[in-house]
Regions:
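Generic alpha-helical propensity signal that fires on short helical segments
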Residues: 46, 52-55, 101, 144-151, ...
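Active-site neighborhood of glycoside hydrolase catalytic domains
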Residues: 6-98
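Alpha-helical structural elements
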Residues: 32, 78, 103-106, 147
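Glycine-rich, flexible loop/turn motifs
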Residues: 24, 104, 138
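Acidic, His- and aromatic-enriched active-site or binding-groove loops in soluble protein domains
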Residues: 2-6, 101-120
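Acidic active-site catalytic centers that drive phospho-/nucleotidyl reactions
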Residues: 1, 42, 130
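Substrate-binding clefts and catalytic carboxylate motifs of secreted carbohydrate-active enzymes
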Residues: 37, 72-75, 84-87, 91-94, ...
């Protein structure tokens, strides 16, 4: 439910989070493919790095949400399924969230850092939960959002607007 942002935890927002999370846990807890619950995507890492945080209360609110509120809800509604506070994480509390020897890591230097594919051979992560390289959608998909065949060019205005990574096209 949470990714790539920091939130001010007002009482109303906390109540909303609790209600929405309870609804989702009840809806999903019996699915055979559920391996674990994860509190958020990339937020522990970016808060630890000082990105996105504008005031100390946001760090406190982060800890309260992902290391207290959500675990309490899961203890009540799905105590059998493992909870991991963030991805990447080394287990929470901002304890080196990208440690390659504990928890999980996200490694995007090949894509975002323009390193060669062989760079993956330099690392032996305990668990790389995110990595990769972007590719184009299928031509059939491209035709669904382009009206003019000239827009099929990867440098066309339409294709550039569909690209969200600064190092792409």
């Amino acid at each position: 439910m949470f990714a790539c942002a920091v939130y001010d935890l007002t009482p109303d927002f906390e109540a909303n989070i609790r209600e929405e999370f309870i609804d989702n846990v009840k809806r999903l807890r019996h699915h055979a493919s559920l391996g674990l619950w994860c509190g958020n995507n990339e937020m522990e890492m970016f808060v630890k790095q000082g990105e996105w945080v504008t005031k100390p209360s946001e760090v406190r609110d982060y800890l309260f949400m992902y290391e207290r509120v959500i675990p309490e809800i899961l203890k009540k509604y799905d105590p059998e399924t493992f909870y991991w506070p963030a991805s990447p994480s080394s287990g929470g509390c901002f304890d080196d969230p990208s440690d390659p020897n504990r928890g999980d890591v996200h490694y995007w230097d090949v894509w975002h850092g323009n390193k060669p594919f062989s760079d993956y051979r330099n690392y032996y992560f305990r668990y790389a939960s995110e990595f990769g390289f972007q590719s184009f959608p299928s031509f059939e998909t491209i035709k669904t959002f382009t009206d003019d065949p000239a827009d099929w060019n990867i440098f066309s205005y339409v294709m550039e607007k569909h690209q969200r990574n600064a190092g792409a096209n």
